[in-house]
Amino acid sequence: MGSVMSLGCSKRKATNQDVDSESRKRRKICSTNDAENCRFIQDESSWKHPWSLCANRVISVAAVALTNFRFQQDNQESNSSSLSLPSPATSVSRNWKHDVFPSFHGADVRRTFLSHIMESFRRKGIDTFIDNNIERSKSIGPELKEAIKGSKIAIVLLSRKYASSSWCLDELAEIMKCRQMVGQIVMTIFYEVDPTDIKKQTGEFGKAFTKTCRGKPKEQVERWRKALEDVATIAGYHSHSWRNEADMIEKISTDVSNMLNSFTPSRDFDGLVGMRAHMDMLEQLLRLDLDEVRMIGIWGPPGIGKTTIARFLFNQVSDRFQLSAIMVNIKGCYPRPCFDEYSAQLQLQNQMLSQMINHKDIMISHLGVAQERLRDKKVFLVLDEVDQLGQLDALAKETRWFGPGSRIIITTEDLGVLKAHGINHVYKVEYPSNDEAFQIFCMNAFGQKQPHEGFDEIAWEVTCLAGELPLGLKVLGSALRGKSKREWERTLPRLKTSLDGKIGSIIQFSYDVLCDEDKYLFLYIACLFNGESTTKVKELLGKFLDVKQGLHLLAQKSLISFDGERIHMHTLLEQFGRETSRKQFVHHGFTKRQLLVGARGICEVLDDDTTDSRRFIGIHLELSNTEEELNISEKVLERVHDFHFVRIDASFQPERLQLALQDLIYHSPKIRSLNWYGYESLCLPSTFNPEFLVELDMRSSNLRKLWEGTKQLRNLKWMDLSYSSYLKELPNLSTATNLEELKLRNCSSLVELPSSIEKLTSLQILDLENCSSLEKLPAIENATKLRELKLQNCSSLIELPLSIGTATNLKQLNISGCSSLVKLPSSIGDITDLEVFDLSNCSSLVTLPSSIGNLQNLCKLIMRGCSKLEALPININLKSLDTLNLTDCSQLKSFPEISTHISELRLKGTAIKEVPLSIMSWSPLADFQISYFESLMEFPHAFDIITKLHLSKDIQEVPPWVKRMSRLRDLSLNNCNNLVSLPQLSDSLDYIYADNCKSLERLDCCFNNPEIRLYFPKCFKLNQEARDLIMHTCIDAMFPGTQVPACFIHRATSGDSLKIKLKESPLPTTLRFKACIMLVKVNEELMSYDQTPMIVDIVIRDEHNDLKEKIYPSIYPSIYPLLTEHIYTFELDVEEVTSTELVFEFPQLNKRNWKIGECGILQRETRSLRRSSSPDLSPESSRVSSYDHCLRGD
């Protein structure tokens, strides 16, 4: 019986307290230096902001309300345990009586708008309070107050005559009281009324309010007035913004429905056992009250429940973070060793960002993108099943990649990976206690934590045989569920003789109860298709099995699960399936369908010259991670045949073995899936028969061509030859009428596609990215199902086919980097479903056809870097266009009035010299970037809409009217060599970047925004007063300087660390410091303008060398550009300071070329809260006091 019988299984029913107490003793919080040392730490709450209902990340009114509600709740509960779990009885905090309480003035809306929205609520199952049976009086009574308080959401429908009713005003006052006291969510609808009139009680609304207030007590009037002022500031739905009232109602009811879903407690984790103890331990490691970025490892054997714990933790705390994501089964997506490690890491990072920011088709070009996108975001990231350091390097290489307060959770079986990555916060997951194991088993066998009557004894016996492994308990319990006690008793003797507590025996039992067809499906998934989409598996195996029903049954038996569309089988189950397949050959020879998997299993079969000639159905061989040469008999390879599924990665293997393996294709005329990574031959064998082929995946191959002539391809659905850089041509594909995806990315030698492409009537995705030799596309007049066409960086492509207009279902067209493309066909306007059109860096393109005006579903038009583009079509209005980017279209002279719905307009680097008045009607416009031109002052209406201004090189002064740009956030003055001074500028500015302004001497201004960032690289003529102003009035700065200024009384003139002593008086909660560093070159041969950023950490330790903080500068986790004779300053907050001595260290990467020559620290004003909270001092007083403080040297 092995170790199972040593468990000493007890039938005693433990109390919850006993279970938790025992669990705590068995679980460890480990440091990587000593895996048995335990640490216990306290915790607090934090919160998450984004909650998006729309794919384009627009946050709805409902989402904002919900976020505020959650924030209030977090504030109210900040002193409680942040991971404390609700009991079943209290999982819903209140007994709600209604979903929605509407407050409205009946005469205005009851028979029109209100009746329609109530009907929409009814159709969506939203319970709305109706006051038909309440008798009206001068003031609202207890019944109505209870109805308001008992509603999850209050919707205030503000109309012109709303304030004419004292009843409505009393309702509103009560609603706003509930909002303040109990965090009730309040949504607003402004129906034919301006919020300003409500806030200020003006206009027709104000007249009605004045009339209602006559003769009323002053206290009551003030209560009404305060309620109106408050409700007017709540972002809501404006009827004036909607052309169609029905659309507005549908939007409101959908938002309300989605919000109500958040009130429904999750049942996804009901029935999990022992989670309270796991969360208590993890709480000590998470320390959500700290702003440091922390990585936590969850370490334990396979099947112990690491993934379940991580998912549960994610469910508990992820909504307190700005961004969150779970990356599952990472090791399955990252081969070892990796043929192209950089590409694999890039793909992993791409997947992470895609989930994190909800951008399905995100494209990244280098591994620094994650750091750039996430460095200021509070992130909760789970990295599941990590087994290589390279995976962590791709996804979470440094804590500086993420914003303050971020938490990265890594689950792994390998403690060495965590040690190598420097992760010293590790939670070791121990096996559950006897009582917990029994409850886990019972939950899966009986659907409750106790066995059914009469099953007590036998349930305990089976639990003991499961070896306390959660996966085994789950699988075995599911297998016995619903069976009679007699069936259990017949099964038990067999379990006792074959089970020794190992998971393989447990899975064997669950496997044996499957019918033969489901067993085959299980083995197919384990050996070939783990991680594949259900669609592909159904297509590939549908000929042999009832895949749909089989997948459903395997999922019920807990043998597989689904991650969206993809099938997931646990690693242990996969290992069991592969081992079972190998044993079948050993015990049964070729009497069963054979699946050859892994070098060991394949060698056992193929290294014996006596092996009979027999049929095989599938082979999965990964040899790229096998260093020793395999001894496979070539004679055997000649006799094994009839493979339907071939999956091989033989990279780095000897040519002899490569050629021998290719014989498998010769003798397999009915192949359905050929997946061969790094195929070495120049062409597939002439005898290769693709007639039955459904999937062809030959990525990173050495192919020059696939085959000669025309072959029958009627079953082919997926073809991927990406990264086959020597591929010069494709065969005739006219018979591939069912092909859905054709991927040829990075086939850089491919010159043209065959004309037979036009026969691909089922094609949905055509990916030709980086096919730099491709000169033309054939006609695609029959590609009516095409959804994505990717042609970016096809730099030799001269034109698009006229037939592209027949691709009426095309959603995304990317021709960025097609630098030889001169014009677009007029038929482009026939692609009426097009949503994203990217023409960036089409540097030869002169104009767009007027037919582009037909693209009424186009959301994004990106033409950045189209340097020859002279004009856009006129007299068109793309009603769906949201983003228009024309940056660096240097020949564009006319203003692009092609839509009135644009929210993001970028005209930097264009030759535009006017801003038409019509732009004022573009109500959605939120981001408007433009370069300066002399006549800009003639368009004062532009001053209220420009957010980013780029000044030209020849400018001699910044016009004084720039100060009037009330929304200006960014100002760039690069290479303005004649500029001598800066005048007073807009207080709205967040960022000024003045690079290489060689004559700039004075700053005749002050900066009233304490959060402003000022950068003046290579402005060497700046006088001392200007440099002092820059240094002391912003949170981040860069400017010329030869030494750390004397006002930094704590200085180190050599090295990158220094020690400071604080005053002995009581220390505040938070201390603020300004840090200053100056760089020196290590390599004197470097150019003075280094293009590589330098990463700088700030590590703060106390006198005991204990780490207090590890942070980075408040704007950049890296310094750029790197320049000598320049000063870099930035502010930082240090929280919970208890020591009177602090050591500041400035470790940096890129030390080969640069190092920190001098550094300094200046203690600023102290605050009890971080900068995100309300400051103690006004911006102006903060600026002056810190400036004086520095001059005095105190």
From Swiss-Prot:
Limits of the TIR domain: 96-260
Superkingdom: Eukaryota
Gene Ontology annotations for the cellular component aspect, listed alphabetically: endoplasmic reticulum membrane; Golgi membrane; plasma membrane
Keyword Membrane: no
Enzyme Commission number(s): 3.2.2.6
Pfam families on file: C-JID, LRR_14, LRR_3, NB-ARC, TIR, WHD_ROQ1
Region (Disordered): 1-27, 1170-1194
Domain topic, free-text comment: The TIR domain mediates NAD(+) hydrolase (NADase) activity. Self-association of TIR domains is required for NADase activity.
Function, in words: TIR-NB-LRR receptor-like protein that confers resistance to the pathogen Hyaloperonospora arabidopsis. Probably acts as a NAD(+) hydrolase (NADase): in response to activation, catalyzes cleavage of NAD(+) into ADP-D-ribose (ADPR) and nicotinamide; NAD(+) cleavage triggering a defense system that promotes cell death.
Protein name from the UniProt record: Probable disease resistance protein RPP1
Annotated organism of origin: Arabidopsis thaliana
